[in-house]
Amino acid sequence: MDATYTMAQTPVQGQPSFAYYPTESQSRQQHFTSHPFEMQYYGQVSSYPQQQAQQQHSMPEQQPVYAAQPMLNMHQMATTNAFRGALSMTPIASPQPTHLKPTIIVQQDSPALMPLDTRFVSNDFYGFPSTPPLSTSGSTISSPPSSNGSLHTPINDCFFSFEKVEGVKEGCESDVHCELLANTDWSRSDSPPLTPVFIQPQSLTASQSSDLLSAQIPCPSLSPSPSPDSATFISHPQSILSAEPSGSDFCDPRQLTVESSVGAPAELPPLPTLSCNEEEPKVVLGSATVTLPVHEGLSPSFSSSSEDPLGSLPTFDSFSDLDSEDEFANKLVDFHPIGNTYFQGDKRQRLGTYLLDEDEFLSERSLEDLDDQEAFAQSGLPSVESTDFLAVEGDATQSTEEMSSKKRVTSRRSLKKASTSESSSDSLAKKTQASATSRSGHSDTTSTVQQSTASSRQNSTANTSNSESPAAPVSVNRRGRKQSLTDDPSKTFVCSLCSRRFRRQEHLKRHYRSLHTQDKPFECHECGKKFSRSDNLAQHARTHGGGSIVMGVIDTNSSNTQPAFDEPEPRALGLALYEAANAATSKSTTSESSDGTISDTSSVGGRPAKKRRRDDHV
């Protein structure tokens, strides 16, 4: 029989092999020519298997052979390898040549070795019938197409034939049926359901098993399976079990009775009620006033247990830990906003109703360092008018609280007033007197007021320094950010009204214009708004360049008209000092000053939108 199986010596290129029959007795069989891209592994279908079997012994050298080519795809290889073990092939040496390894030999005339073709290309090939199905099969999901019309083996668990569920659309019945099968109640199925049955142990006698089931025969729908454990009974409250032989330890599906789906609905399982001592019970199950009904008539007691399994279950009281405490929740969750909250970090973010003027926005561009800022640097704080200057000066505690409320407050140093020399006070008096004499109509009164005011300020300063009080309170109007509260002797320019010292004369002039007077020499050329400082005008000019709306600010001259002084000396003095100092640098003054003591320290140059030039003469 060695010649029966011929190894096809095919080259690696995979040329097709030919099987031919020279004798006339074999001419009735069709000639087969294999091709690499056709279904070669089925071989030639023989019409006369008996004649072929005789020819197999008579002329073994002419036996038609099926030779698979190396270029078979993976599907054909895997299908043929499944039947390789059933062949009685000729033993070959273990190290085979590389061109012979993929060659697979299958005997042609053995129909039992032919694999199933699930594709069913044509009727020329073998088509074995499918696996016999179960009793009833309503599903052919994931099954190959049938060639002979027989049902295929179902591969899912939804093979029961269900009745139509009311209120379900067509096409959705399978989802509903799967949900019904997932539950423990399979009474809707027409076939015997897989009822969970508790198998009694071997120690239980037949008389005991018949005694357990005797009370449950009349009502098979409400008869749970006997269980020695009460917890398992609660987990399966609707198990359906009918009478069975007393000597059996297993459930025979043929003797089970199935309740019709048209019958009365099953009752809820008897559960223990949750007893609460409060007037309004709060059940943990979610509702505030719902309690489950009490079922007095429970299922018949079992002889395997001494007492009712449900009666021995503990009762549940109300959980006080789960009740919501309003005080605890409100204190944690409710965050009421505080009404007096102010954001001092941003200059333009304000929540209070302040009287805002653009003069109050001070810019550090015109200062040499942070110590040169004046005491009345107002950034988002209430403005101080010139008429109520003494009222603000007398209110010490309120100003101190406003200073501490700023975001970038520095540590305060001790307030010490250094005694100024008489020469500096005399020179300041001479300067102010010369400025006052240059002003027409105010020469006599202004000079007299300046001398008296300066002398009184210097005398009070000298008395304070001589008494050696280390923390003598100065004017509480010092609200600038990060400034030195001790007077530096190098700051020669002293304000005669508030004793504020400056290194530059232009800072002193700006201090007078911003705080002590209401003169606004800088005017916006687009909207006509006037400002007392050039940097405020430059800041205002950006609003026109960006196309934003210019907000009107209340004129401070007309807002407060009640004088806080008995005599108008501070206003007249401030106007005289400003115009005298601005005479040499600005063309908008009313008189020309020829005094050489007040030099040209800064030049605005008639261009208020540009930066001021600084020339130190200290």
From Swiss-Prot:
Biased composition (Low complexity): 417-432, 443-458, 582-597
The protein's name in its UniProt record: C2H2 finger domain transcription factor sebA
Superkingdom to which the source organism belongs: Eukaryota
BP term (GO), one: cellular response to oxidative stress
Compositionally biased intervals (Basic residues): 406-416, 608-618
UniProt-listed PANTHER family: MIP31509P, ZINC FINGER PROTEIN YPR022C
Keywords: Cytoplasm, Metal-binding, Nucleus, Repeat, Stress response, Transcription, Transcription regulation, Virulence, Zinc, Zinc-finger
A GO cellular component entry from the record: cytosol
Major localization class: nucleus
